[in-house]
Regions:
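Residue-level "edge-of-site" marker
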Residues: 18, 100, 138-139
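Short secondary-structure capping/turn micro-motifs that flank functional sites
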Residues: 21-22, 40, 103, 141-143
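Secondary-structure end/capping motifs
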Residues: 56-132
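Pocket-lining segment of extracytoplasmic ligand-binding domains
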Residues: 1-88
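Residue-level detector of family-conserved "landmark" positions at structurally sensitive sites
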Residues: 33-34, 97-99, 135-136
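A local structural motif
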Residues: 7-11, 29, 94, 131-137
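Conserved C-terminal helix/tail region of periplasmic/extracytoplasmic solute-binding proteins
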Residues: 126-158
Length: 158
């Protein structure tokens, strides 16, 4: 996509990182307009498991969430090493990874921002006719806070 933009074959494209960063580096900030949060939307990566799996595998779920919290701590305490790990595993240059990661907010959290995003998506789905219901779910009722409350209670603000 970046090459097509440089050649003038396209006027715009919609992609995830690293391509917006690479386009800006290649073409220059003055010629590239990258729309990102809060301009368009926020992005979260959520863990979703079925109740049955959770009930049968509580130890595994706890270990998984604990590993994510430890990874977050490592990232915060070792930013240089974290960049090198991501660069090695993605094949991207450390400078590219650094430019991308500076824009990110890494955290294992349950907060009101997540609830807001879920409600916005529900409203969108209802308007698009993608939902069999016209009611926005009460997401507080379906979000399991028990593991994160045990591991890192400060991360739970909902």
């Amino acid at each position: 996509m970046v090459t097509a933009l440089i050649k003038g074959e396209i006027d715009a494209f919609i992609v995830f990182e690293p391509y917006p960063f690479l386009a800006t580096e290649e073409i220059g900030e003055e010629k590239v307009n990258v729309f990102s949060e809060p301009d368009l939307y926020g992005e979260t990566w959520n863990i979703v498991i079925m109740d049955e799996f959770n009930n049968e595998n509580k130890g595994t779920v706890f270990k998984f969430i604990n590993a994510l919290v430890k990874a977050e701590q490592y990232l915060n305490e070792n930013p240089k090493e974290s960049l090198e790990i991501v660069a090695k595993n993605t094949g991207l240059d450390v400078d590219v990874v650094s430019g991308i990661m500076k824009k990110q907010n890494f955290g294992v959290v349950l907060n009101n921002e997540l609830i807001g995003y879920l409600k916005e998506e529900a409203i969108w789905a209802i308007k698009q006719g993608l939902s069999s219901s016209n009611e926005i779910p009460n997401y507080i009722d379906v979000i399991n806070r028990e593991y994160l409350l045990e591991i890192n209670p400060e991360a739970v603000t909902i």
